[in-house]
Amino acid sequence: MNKIFTGCSILVLISFIVSACGASPVIADTTPAAPPSFTASPLPLSTTTETLIPSPVPTATPIPHPLEIRAMRAREYPGSDIVIETVLDPGVNYNRYYISYLSEGLKIYALMTVPMGEKPATGWPVVIFNHGFIRPDVYVSTERYIAYVDLIARSGYIVFRSDYRGHGNSEGEAGGAYSRPDYTVDVLNAVASVKRYPDADPNRIGMWGHSMGGYITLRSMVVTGDIKAGVIWAGVVASYPDLLTRWRRGTGATPTRTPSPSSWRFSLMQQYGSPEENPEFWNSISANSYLGEISGPVQLHHGTLDEDVPLEFSELLFYQMLDAQQYVEFYKYEGDNHNISNYFGQAMQRTIEFFDRYVKFGL
């Protein structure tokens, strides 16, 4: 395992990381291309002595794609009051609830834990928990990620794990995370909802994400300033151009630029062209283009034998965070898989210590 920090000794650390990891990762080009210029052709003159001056043609303001970060920042995420639907069996030192809240008028369900004991004067710190891809037709709120939620909840946090739209009993369509902002919208409304909850401290909110949930976490942290720190395990955290060309699954797989007609890649490329043809668009929908404005420090974890999400994604984000002069920690787990199963205990300890440092105690 390697532990990589950014801080005052960053130049020495970068040298160490490069030698430890092999070839230096390629940083995605986030420089937008200059917009095309437009020159109006003159109209022919009338045969009379009067010269006709053409009226200016109004230029339509392009409608931003819903995935664009500037479009997401312009939206409102009011959330709602939290409704306790079912009281579940408690944990060792925390209560468990099956709750609901509203997101774009949809009733979204979630699992929420609340510590037992006397509440701090400002309320309990919160961790918004973003799960990875689970087929919506088999998703169950109280299954999967049980040990993850338990360890964070035992450490004195409200844990709020949203069932994104179309998952479990949540209303709406499960349209995926990468072609629509829907799941991120549901999470941002979860943030707003938990801020209303009387036992929660609205100024001490962190976010945890695994795989697809890491994508949602990174996007959330460049859209809102409410998230004080983020922890991402095996995250889909590359820029969109890198998602197109570097996301390969399974041993021996190779990058492809020919996505299937049913994929989000094909749909976006058909409408907006490739990243080479339209870099401005692809950068505008990538959270990586906005790391200079991220809401807090980030901790990354990734197994070196992950066959679902490339280790390279976390490596790229690490260097991009450094370039943006943002605080980041990066842990690699030798020989471990997508769920970091072999080093789970150590990774969770580091996760909780990070949240304690930057969320619970606000250092």
Regions inferred by a protein language model and the residue ranges of each:
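Ser/Thr-rich, Proline-interspersed low-complexity disordered segments
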Residues: 21-67, 251-260
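Alpha/beta-hydrolase active-site loop
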Residues: 178-198
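Mobile cap/lid helix-loop segments that gate and shape the active-site cleft of serine hydrolases
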Residues: 139, 241-290, 296
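N-terminal cap/lid segment of alpha/beta-hydrolase-fold proteins
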Residues: 76-122
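Short glycine-enriched nucleophile-adjacent loop
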Residues: 214-225
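C-terminal catalytic histidine-bearing segment of alpha/beta-hydrolase fold enzymes
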Residues: 315-363
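Short substrate-entry loop that stabilizes the transition state in hydrolases
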Residues: 119-124, 129-171, 239-240
